[in-house]
């Protein structure tokens, strides 16, 4: 993928739309490179309708890649649902509350309700694609 911003391919939009009712996936733009202000070393980062991927992480040709895209699309839906500033405030508040409870960084991050929801979407897409793949292989 180029460093330029681009739309999700039509096939990806068609594949993921049933998993995200109420979200117009044609509005989503993707680009390579995580913004410098993002803490840590994420493979993906969503900001409203824009998704940033670490170099090489944006893969529309693998089940894992499509599942990662679904994870980030879930965050786009969360932004739409809560608004940008409210989403960010709640996200950070949940993280810091988890840290104050004594969780290490990774556990605090993974316990953020927004991340739990995004992982559920990621896993749902992964399972659906694996089932589809199995059915396809059985027909061969």
Where do the model's predicted regions map?
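Metalloprotease/metallohydrolase-associated module, dominated by Zn2+-dependent proteases
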Residues: 2-32, 38-48, 83-140
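Short, aliphatic-rich beta-strand segments
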Residues: 49-55
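Short helix-loop capping/hinge motifs at secondary-structure junctions, enriched
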Residues: 58-59
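Activation segment
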Residues: 55, 77-78, 122
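Short alpha-helix carrying the canonical HExxH Zn2+-binding catalytic motif
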Residues: 62-78
């Amino acid at each position: 993928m180029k460093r330029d911003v681009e739309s999700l391919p039509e096939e990806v939009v068609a594949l993921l739309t049933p998993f995200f009712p109420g979200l117009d996936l044609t509005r989503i733009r993707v680009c390579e490179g995580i913004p410098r202000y993002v803490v840590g070393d994420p493979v993906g980062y969503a900001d409203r309708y824009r998704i940033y991927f670490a170099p090489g992480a944006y893969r529309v040709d693998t089940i894992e890649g499509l599942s990662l895209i679904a994870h980030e699309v879930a965050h786009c839906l969360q932004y739409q649902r809560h608004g940008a500033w409210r989403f960010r405030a709640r996200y950070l508040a949940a993280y810091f509350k988890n840290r104050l409870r004594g969780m290490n960084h990774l556990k605090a991050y993974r316990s953020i309700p927004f991340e739990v929801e995004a992982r559920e979407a990621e896993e749902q897409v992964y399972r659906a694609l694996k089932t589809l793949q199995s059915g396809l292989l059985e027909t061969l």
